[in-house]
C-alpha cells in the first residue's frame, strides 16, 4: 500500500484537478521553474493550485525538466530535441540536488515512520 508519494515536475494533464483537492495520501512536489517540456504554469503550478494539501518540497527556479535525473543521459545518445528538453538550463547548478534529496527523505520520514 502506498502511504506517501513525491512527484518531480508533475504533468497536470495526468490528473483530474478535482481528484487532487483531497488526496488520500500525503503528496510532495519538486518543481522546476525553467521546464520547457512541462511548462510550469500549465503543469506543476496547476497541480499546486488544485492540490492545496500538497507540499512543495523544493522549487528550483533555474531547473529544467530533468532536474531529478542523476546522472543525466550522455549527450551523445540524445537527439537534438531530446538534448534541448533534458539539458540543464544555463545557470542551474546540480550542487543544489543533495539538499533536495535530503528534503525528499525528510518528507518520507515524516509521513512513513511511526
Regions found by a protein language model. Give the residues of each.
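Primarily recognizes the serine-hydrolase "nucleophile elbow" in alpha/beta-hydrolase
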Residues: 1-22
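Conserved, well-structured beta-alpha core segment at the onset of a catalytic domain
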Residues: 14-18, 29, 112-114
Amino acid at each position: 500500500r502506498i502511504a506517501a508519494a513525491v512527484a518531480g515536475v508533475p504533468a497536470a494533464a495526468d490528473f483530474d484537478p478535482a481528484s487532487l483537492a483531497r488526496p488520500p495520501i500525503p503528496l510532495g512536489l519538486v518543481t522546476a521553474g525553467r521546464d520547457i517540456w512541462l511548462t510550469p504554469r500549465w503543469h506543476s503550478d496547476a497541480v499546486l493550485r488544485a492540490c492545496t494539501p500538497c507540499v512543495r518540497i523544493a522549487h528550483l527556479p533555474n531547473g529544467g525538466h530533468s532536474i531529478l535525473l542523476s546522472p543525466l543521459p550522455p549527450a551523445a545518445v540524445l537527439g537534438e530535441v531530446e538534448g534541448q528538453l533534458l539539458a540543464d538550463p544555463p545557470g542551474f547548478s546540480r550542487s543544489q540536488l543533495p539538499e533536495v534529496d535530503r528534503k525528499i527523505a525528510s518528507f518520507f520520514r515524516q509521513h512513513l515512520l511511526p
